[in-house]
A protein has these predicted regions:
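TerminUS-proximal long segments
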Residues: 469, 639, 643-728
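Long, contiguous internal "core" modules enriched in hydrophobic/ aromatic residues
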Residues: 292-324, 377, 415, 419, ...
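N-terminal signal-anchor module of multipass membrane proteins
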Residues: 291-362, 366, 703, 707, ...
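Alpha-helical transmembrane segments
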Residues: 270-284, 325, 367-368, 440-441, ...
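Non-ligating segments of multi-cofactor redox enzymes
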Residues: 1-292
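Membrane-interface transmembrane-helix boundary segments in multi-pass integral membrane proteins
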Residues: 258-262, 331, 424, 542-552, ...
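Membrane-interface helix-loop junction between the first two transmembrane segments
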Residues: 32-41, 283-294, 327-343, 372-375
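Membrane helical hairpin/interfacial module
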Residues: 344-408, 425-432, 436
Length: 728
């Protein structure tokens, strides 16, 4: 929200660093007004008068101590005291990040927080360019803490008496104005803090600079930085020497606004395009099938292998370890059970989710390839891809429950209407996609256990469900009735045109929904990091990062389908259909090629190759591109190489690991974690035993349940089963 778009005056505080005497009266007043406990402090020689070291859940305002060079001062140095607190951006990144409007900007300036709406995702902590929000890690239900610009003081009722004497109307208003002033400003004895409208504070700042050019640098920090803030600074030394980050004028939420604003029309466009592709390819394939009398019928049956094997017992032990870790996370609390901190609010579990979602993309890729593009030669691996996708996304949801600080507030995702929140889009999109995966897989148990009526109902009504689900998604994301109606028309028309006319009808609407929703959430996982150009290295950050995430997921998901099919053949001693896998490898080749060309082309257009290969991050980037991209691209480049099982395995493994490494770099390795304002103390991060336990347990559960489902239901083709001896 720009100043021009504001509905009225913006309440603003001007901080004059040149006048601050470091008394910390503001710091004490802030604690008193917000009823925050004191915290144990330590004398640290490099911090001087600064105590505590950083902002925290109990310290919203902090006076930071700086020693700056000044040849004219005794000893060649002078002290500068800087008030650190929330800057209350005019276009706050934390508000753009919040998926539930727990963080929201008031029309007159303050960025406020409502704990009752917070789900504890901590995305705001990473998104804030000033590193202000903190979590109460000592609590079993860690909430976000930050300065609210004393917005609650304005809500205080008008006083009607003072010291037992009734007040006149003018006196009451004067006292009310005094109360409404932020506690820190009221406590300042040195004319270092002023409070008023933004226009008044800018005028006063310019007056002071003009009156004393020898005392101030000609820069009002916060006037234009990232679109402007409601807290402005004056200083006698350059702000960079005081640790202030150097930012341009463009607010970071502008990046996500562009990306997420394209989602509603993209949903309609992708759905319509997929419907057109299906109509074209179905007609062409039908003609070929009628001429050859080959309609590609494939039979499935349960795997005839014993469940009690050493391998499965190991999986059960790991699952028990994961279950114990999951319970421990809630008994101990998020802070005590993990090594997460204000420096690293996201850790192994978020990394785990981003990697898992990327490599599980094979489910939507195979659905689109088999049904939309009518590749019936790949129909035999469709069920395994969908089952693995269903299990993977289900356990991603479990991981998110463990990672959320307040998971019992998740219902707020259905009640709030945040503006341009990538987290909100991902949450709804993934949730709806899980239901699509479930509907795609349900015909398998229905066929196994003879639920013919349920199967008929699913076949008849899945199109209507898809139209309703996608329309709901578009409305929730845009809050635009026109977009919602247009989406209903597009997907309703597709559902009617492709409605089931017999028992052999294809679930094309589910396939269209799978591809559409996956396109949106795979790309929006990249949108999560559009708010962090100040943290993510330029080799990975890009305004088109969402497209890069989507393209790379296709390559990784397709490659994982190959690895799973090879694992099935090896683990259960099944025949390996190299012809079929070579065809999947060809899809992986083109997906990987498009991804690499797009990503490297984007870097070239933005001029990011200069220095891209230098330093440790340069080596990481080179390894990701070379080993995870170019090498598998070469190995998948020809049919002869793809039909060699060993080379196909290596190429697929490298492609999966390359995309996984890309997500690791984006989440952790290529990020600059500075800690909380004023960036003097940054903790290290090593995942705890509980974090590892939950992650390992869920991986084991995925593998075990996949094997269990294959034994109980017709997941594998009849050609893949037989009387071969059990391997494991």
């Amino acid at each position: 929200m720009s100043e021009a778009a504001a509905t009225g005056p913006i309440r603003t505080t001007l901080i004059d660093i040149a006048n601050c005497i470091g008394c910390r009266a503001c710091q004490v007043a802030c604690k008193q007004w917000n009823e925050k406990d004191g915290e144990q402090t330590f004398l640290e020689s490099d911090l001087g008068f600064q105590n505590p070291a950083t902002l925290s859940a109990r310290t919203y305002t902090l006076i930071a101590f700086h020693e700056v060079e000044n040849p004219a001062s005794p000893g060649g140095a002078e002290s500068a005291f800087v008030m650190q607190r929330c800057l209350h951006c005019l276009e706050p990144a934390c508000v753009s990040a919040c998926p539930t409007t727990a963080l929201h900007r008031q029309a007159d300036g303050p960025v406020s927080y409502d704990a009752d709406e917070c789900i504890g995702c901590r995305y705001c902590q990473l998104a804030c360019p000033w590193d202000v929000p903190t979590s109460d890690w000592n609590s079993h239900a860690p909430k976000i803490s930050k300065c609210t610009h004393c917005a609650d003081r304005i809500e205080q009722p008008l006083p009607i008496a003072f010291n037992g004497q009734a007040l006149s109307g003018d006196e009451s208003k004067r006292f009310s104005g005094s109360i409404a002033t932020p506690a820190c400003v009221k406590a300042c004895p040195a004319d270092a803090l002023l409070y008023g409208t933004r226009e008044e504070m800018l005028t006063e700042a310019r007056r002071r600079i003009a009156a004393r050019p020898d005392k101030y640098v000609d820069h009002i920090y916060g006037e234009k930085e990232l679109g402007g803030t409601s807290v402005l600074y004056l200083s006698r030394v350059p702000f960079a020497k005081l640790g202030f980050p150097t930012y341009g004028e463009k607010p970071f939420p502008a990046f996500t606004k562009t990306a997420l604003g394209a989602v509603p029309p993209a949903v309609m466009a992708v759905g319509a395009m997929l419907g057109a592709f299906y109509a074209f390819f179905r007609k062409r394939v039908q003609k070929v099938a009628d001429a050859s009398h080959d309609h590609g019928h494939v039979e499935f049956e349960p795997l005839q292998h014993a469940l009690s094997t050493p391998f499965n017992w190991v999986l059960l032990v790991l699952m028990a370890f994961g279950a114990i870790s999951f319970v421990a996370r809630f008994i101990m609390g998020l802070g005590a059970s993990t090594n997460l901190s204000d420096t690293y609010p996201w850790g192994l579990w978020i990394l785990f989710d981003l990697v898992w979602i990327a490599v599980a993309a094979g489910a939507f890729v195979m659905a689109g390839v088999i049904y939309v593009f009518q590749r019936k030669d790949l129909y035999g691996i469709g069920r395994t891809a969908v089952l693995m996708g269903l299990l993977s996304y289900s356990f991603v949801t479990v991981t998110l429950i463990a990672d959320l600080g307040l998971p019992w507030h998740a219902y707020q995702l259905a009640l709030q209407a945040p503006e341009h929140s990538a987290m909100f889009e991902v949450s709804w999109c993934v949730g709806l996609y899980v239901t699509i995966l479930l509907l795609e897989f349900l015909p398998v148990p229905f066929a196994r256990y003879g639920y013919t009526r349920a199967a008929d109902a699913l076949r008849q009504w899945n199109g209507a469900y898809v139209a309703a689900a996608v329309t709901l998604f578009v409305y929730l994301l845009s809050r635009n009735v026109f977009y919602a109606l247009a989406t209903a028309v597009v997907f309703g028309t597709l559902a009617w045109v492709f409605r089931a006319r017999d028992h052999h009808a294809e679930p094309v609407m589910l396939a269209i929904a799978a591809v559409t929703l996956s396109t949106m959430h795979q790309s929006s996982l990249g949108s999560l990091y559009l708010l962090m150009p100040n943290m993510l290295a330029p080799q990975w950050w890009s305004p088109v990062l969402p497209i890069s995430f989507f393209l790379s997921s296709i390559a990784a998901g397709t490659a994982l389908v190959i690895l799973i099919d090879m694992w099935i053949a090896k683990g259960w001693r099944r025949p390996l259909d190299l012809t079929r896998l070579a065809s999947v490898g060809q899809i992986a080749f083109w997906a990987l090629l498009v991804y690499l060309v797009f990503r490297l082309g984007d870097m070239a257009v933005r001029g990011q190759f200069n220095g891209a290969f230098s330093g440790s991050l340069g080596l990481a980037f080179a390894a990701e591109i070379l080993l995870g991209g170019i090498v598998p691209l070469i190995l998948l480049g020809t049919r002869a190489l793809r039909k060699r099982a060993d080379l196909l395995f290596i190429a697929s493994l490298l492609a999966v690991l390359g995309v996984a490494y890309n997500r690791m770099n984006v989440v952790l390795f290529a990020m600059t974690f500075r800690g909380r304002m004023p960036w003097d103390v940054a903790e290290n991060y090593v995942p705890s035993i509980v974090e590892w336990g939950v992650s390992i347990g869920l991986i084991a559960a995925t593998i075990f349940l996949f094997g269990l489902a294959a034994r109980l239901m017709p997941v594998l083709t009849r050609a893949q089963t037989g009387d071969a001896a059990l391997s494991r």
